[in-house]
Amino acid sequence: MEKSIESISSSTLNILDNKNYKKWDNETVCKWLLNNIKTIQKVSIEIFQANEIIGKDLEFLTDKILLKMGVGIRDILNFKFEYQILKNCYNNNNNNNHITINNFNYNFNNFKININKDLLKVVVNAPIININEYQYIETISKNKFCEIEKYKKSQTKVNEYIIIKKIIKNSTLNEEKLINEIDTIYLLDHPNLIKIIGYCKDKNYFYIGMKYYETFKFKQSNISKFGKNFEQVIRKISFKILSAIDYLHSLEPPIIHGNINAKNILLDNENNEPILIDFGLSYKSIDLLTNQKTQFISPCFITPEYFYKKTKNKISKEADIFSFGSTISNMIKGGTDFKEDEEGFEELKRTFAGVLTSRDKVSFDYRSLFTEINKDEPCFRPSSKELLKSFWFVEPPQPSFKTSEITTNLLIYYLKKYGCYIIRDGVAMVSLNFNENIYSTSSIIGSEFSHQPKINEKHKYFKEINQFYSKILSESFQAKIGWYLLNLNNEFKDKPYFKNIFLSFSTSDKLEINSVADLNLKLTIFFYNSITMSLIYQTIYQKPKSFKIVDYL
């Protein structure tokens, strides 16, 4: 058999000539390449045998390494299966030194491979468990695709429980994909994700063993025992679950959970940690041409894009985020099930609208967070990484100092980091970031102007403009920057010249108005973005102690 055809790149030669074996992680393979410069792009078992290269020496030869060694993408595609075969054969061989080649038949030009399938057993890290060592206790749940059962290890004095997920074998199940999925999840390393112990199979089922965790039911009776601290408890649970979701979404390729709800959050009593369960293993291993993967999505949290746009795909990062936000609200409400139809979807909307209006029960920061998560358009929902930075999750310890210690620099720091919420009657009207230009000019605005702003009282819409201003200030009007709250009603009352500025600009030719609807839109933008923020900046600069430390709830 021919041993060489093409040369490797000059950069690779430099590495090999310098014998920088640590960079390639394997001295044996590098020595072989030094002696056989032209053998990298087509190899055979005989070549590896002749150079005493065994299976474990091949484990580091990933696509990334091969690309660095000068192998082109086309060549990688042509022989990547051959490398996998060689690695699997050596790894599965007891001696790792002897292997037959009678069952291999190569055709590189046509990219055809005929091999003995017995040599291609998938090598996985997840161990094989003996189901006979465990005693069946009870069935926790079941559907037409799988069953979840509780088992106890036999012949032990201590009660050692595990969960067995039995996946039914059928014509649509791709067993190789399922085993790969098991191995992928077995290798996941996050304290808030369920741990796979191992697996086994028989002619009817795949058995997947997982650590047993207690179920914490988010019912109103359980939530109420925390009293006024219930939101903090749920926030801590939610943050840890979100970190697990972010871990899954950050993998390459990402893992989409697809089934986030309170029922899939368990409790590890040993570490008092929430555990996210039931991701993968339910839809990834099923043929994508079937609709079985959708059967595992909880009808509790149908996404708006699925309900309104009738999209067939319920599985996405954005859908996970929507379900996560819905799960938090569902926990706060004490747990509710919803039907997968129009009536159930409308009930879901009413329930979560109730969360947003329960101002005596949930914090403003959560209501603001949920509003962002609950966007109808998936592209407008925050990512898991963005959520982890939100104030509701990462708020610093509540300040222990007095209001007299609030300074301009402190408020500017929080403003730059978290932005400013303009709150009207308990509802966030707008969230604004720090604006250097407005801040630098706000300090000079005041009654000491040499002339008062000119107001055109004969303006066509002067009455409506004046009513707009009065209506806003007739309701509770606040600004929130981190932990600090400013009563805007009082500030506008103390600074009447801001009203004059508002009326002057609104009745000038600078604000082109074509209709009453157009008037309200432009007045709203101008009032919140310019007038209100100017007043806030001036207060930060001149009277920072006007801000008060607000309680969490």
Swiss-Prot record:
Keywords: ATP-binding, Nucleotide-binding. Gene3D superfamilies: Transcription Factor, Ets-1, Transferase(Phosphotransferase) domain 1. One of its GO terms (biological process) is signal transduction. The keyword rRNA-binding does not apply. The protein kinase domain is predicted to be catalytically inactive. Residues 24-90 form the SAM domain. Residues 134-393 form the Protein kinase domain. It comes from Dictyostelium discoideum. This is Probable inactive serine/threonine-protein kinase samkD. ATP binds at I140, S141, K142, N143, K144, F145, C146, E147, I148, K165. One of its GO terms (molecular function) is protein serine/threonine kinase activity. The keyword ATP-binding applies. Belongs to the protein kinase superfamily. Ser/Thr protein kinase family. The gene is samkD. InterPro entries: Kinase-like_dom_sf (IPR011009), PAK3-like (IPR051931), Prot_kinase_dom (IPR000719), SAM (IPR001660), SAM/pointed_sf (IPR013761).
